[in-house]
């Protein structure tokens, strides 16, 4: 019964990334690259450009994954080798639609420190399960990976604040740094093994048993009980 906007904001299929490059102690400009190598042989890497009121620059693979930024001083490049992104022989070649490696390139002037915001977006439309057919819940609110990016960039500060608030839950504890890292990694791995689906127009929250892609068995209930009571009391 939650409001539509609240559900949309909660189920966005995206990861929010801030990258800060501190070049304040250097007399030369410094460049950085953020990207990935496509692994789907049936979906080509591509440049993503759109309405400047939403986003300015991005790279993606097919229709299901992308990295997009709203910062103006970023260029996209598609290449066959990461070296060609960092040390391009001809910058014009970066704009070609060839190559299985895509990256966003940004530069910090000498004696400056800058931060960029990126939204790593995902999208799978249509039926996504066999046996019992289902769609991802977020497809009710987003129509494409570009749509996800536009919304994510518009509300980036909100998601950043939520992430900082979430970090305080563990950073304020008396756990060692090693245990804090392990706990944060475990929570993210747990969330990464979940699926929020729509089956017969009804929401269905599934927790898979990690890499096995099975629904959790009863013996794991004890392991999850304390986590669920804290994080998902419903």
Give the role of each language-model region.
Residues 1-14, 18-216:
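Acidic/polar, glycine-enriched structural segments that form the non-catalytic walls/loops
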Residues 220-234:
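Carboxylate/His-rich catalytic cores and anion/metal-binding grooves
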